[in-house]
């Protein structure tokens, strides 16, 4: 690793969008500011759905509207107003149905496929860190966006990395609540529960603590499977493997918890089938090894030492810091697209776009 040393407020390749006001206003600002990126994501997920679920965009849209839109409207009508704003802001013939389809991409595609993300939560003295790499196909980097949102009539502000057109993903809020996400491949699906990316936004917008976040998850349930690493500024944190048939808590040991893309929490029923890639097992084992080594050698958790762990290339190309496998084609061309690190006691974060083992500008988050 050459070291990421250039400090910036914005990334030169991924836009930062500041959104305030009503749900529709937030959506319109989002959509109009990254219109090209929203259209790019529609194009890319049209391809992605064809590869993973063997359906066209039109078929995916019909599935999204018939199975998931009624639930979102019932559980959180304001977020539908925001999605409508995104569609009208992005223009070019996009409709609310298209944006809903983007926001249920996990429910459509990831019951058949999983990406490759590695995440960590670590409590170090008075510091509470969350960190992860987000791995996906290279083309999706062109559709990434950093969203800063201040909803009307709320004292909570949000910062998160997302994909243009998608209302929630990986990030933190000004109350000191943060979340990381790992895809879990499981066929379990319940359209009466909240879709994954809508849930991520709900947590960031309303949870002031770890306990709040757990209560929200329990209240609404997850439409498909996802892993969350959740933490708050008090230092309370844990990993929760969420699924439509139940949630499985993994408590920290030795001051940390690590996860990748397979279920391993206690209590999972045998009927909940898991289909991870082999590298999911090796990546989480390697993250544990690196974390234990640092602890044994007295190396404190900091943004710099976390970045070093997330830059690890042992087992390349399917390493913590991924590179595209030689000869890989289509959706097998996974690579690390971005790294998100958060320290919740100070409500600060550092983000790099690209593989963290390379020399990249650091985007700083604060409130």
Language-model segments: which ranges?
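Internal mixed beta-strand/loop scaffold within catalytic domains of large alpha/beta enzymes
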Residues: 102-199, 337-341, 349-351, 358
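C-terminus-biased signal that marks the final domain/tail of proteins
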Residues: 1-115, 204-247, 252-367
């Amino acid at each position: 690793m050459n070291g990421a040393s250039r400090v910036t407020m914005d990334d030169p390749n991924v836009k930062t969008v500041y959104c305030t006001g009503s749900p529709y206003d937030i959506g319109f600002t989002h959509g109009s500011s990254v219109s090209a990126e929203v259209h790019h994501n529609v194009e890319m997920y049209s391809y992605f759905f064809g590869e993973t679920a063997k359906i066209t965009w039109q078929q995916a849209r019909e599935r999204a509207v018939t199975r998931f839109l009624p639930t979102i409207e019932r559980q959180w009508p304001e977020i539908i107003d925001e999605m409508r704003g995104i569609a009208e802001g992005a223009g070019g013939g996009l409709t609310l149905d298209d944006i809903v389809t983007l926001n249920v991409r996990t429910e459509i595609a990831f019951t058949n496929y999983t990406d490759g993300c590695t995440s960590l939560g670590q409590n170090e003295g008075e510091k509470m860190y969350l960190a992860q790499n987000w791995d996906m196909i290279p083309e999706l980097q062109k559709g990434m966006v950093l969203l800063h949102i201040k909803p009307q009539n709320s004292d909570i502000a949000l910062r998160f990395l997302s994909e243009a057109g998608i209302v929630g993903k990986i990030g933190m809020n000004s109350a000191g609540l943060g979340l990381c996400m790992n895809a879990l491949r499981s066929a379990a699906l319940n359209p009466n529960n909240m879709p994954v990316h809508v849930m991520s936004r709900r947590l960031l917008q309303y949870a002031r603590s770890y306990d709040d976040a757990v209560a929200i998850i329990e209240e609404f349930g997850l439409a498909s499977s996802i892993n969350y690493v959740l933490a708050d500024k008090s230092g309370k944190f844990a990993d929760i493997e969420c699924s439509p048939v139940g949630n499985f808590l993994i408590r920290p040991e030795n001051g940390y918890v690590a996860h990748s893309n397979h279920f391993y929490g206690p209590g999972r029923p045998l009927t909940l089938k898991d289909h991870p890639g082999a590298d999911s097992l090796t990546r989480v084992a390697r993250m544990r090894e690196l974390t234990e080594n640092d602890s044994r050698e007295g190396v404190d958790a900091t943004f710099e030492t976390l970045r070093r762990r997330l830059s690890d290339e042992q087992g390349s190309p399917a390493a913590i810091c991924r590179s595209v496998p030689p000869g890989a084609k289509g959706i097998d061309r996974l690579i690390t697209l971005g790294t998100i690190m958060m320290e919740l006691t100070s409500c600060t974060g550092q983000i790099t776009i690209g593989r963290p083992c390379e020399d990249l500008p650091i985007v700083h988050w604060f409130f």
